[in-house]
């Protein structure tokens, strides 16, 4: 599996709205914790260490 960095989410604006809404009403600490949990859930779903390493490099 390779890292996909081209747009790949159907209705990206809808997803972004869902993501923002998930943070509604949270404190900064709660929002940071939500982001951390989401990252770990998605990393577990991907499961491929090489893809995760490539994603970390791309994000940095």
Task: Tell me the role of every PLM-derived stretch.
Residues 1-4, 10-14, 21, 28-29, ...:
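N-terminal intrinsically disordered, cationic/polar leader segments
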Residues 13-16, 39:
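Short amphipathic alpha-helical surface patches that serve as generic macromolecular interface elements
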Residues 15, 34-35, 52:
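N-terminal alpha-helical segment
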Residues 19-20, 24, 37:
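Eukaryotic low-complexity, mixed-charge intrinsically disordered interaction/regulatory segments enriched
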Residues 23, 43-46, 59:
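Generic structural signal for hydrophobic core residues of well-folded globular domains
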Residues 34-46:
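An amphipathic alpha-helical micro-motif enriched in hydrophobic residues
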Residues 49-60:
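Short, charged early-sequence alpha-helical segments and their helix-coil boundaries
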């Amino acid at each position: 599996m390779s890292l996909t960095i081209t747009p790949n989410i159907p209705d990206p604006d809808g997803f972004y709205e869902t993501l923002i809404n998930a943070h509604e009403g949270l404190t900064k600490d709660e929002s940071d914790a939500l982001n951390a949990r989401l990252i770990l859930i998605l990393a577990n779903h991907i499961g491929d260490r090489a893809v995760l390493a490539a994603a970390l490099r791309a994000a940095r």
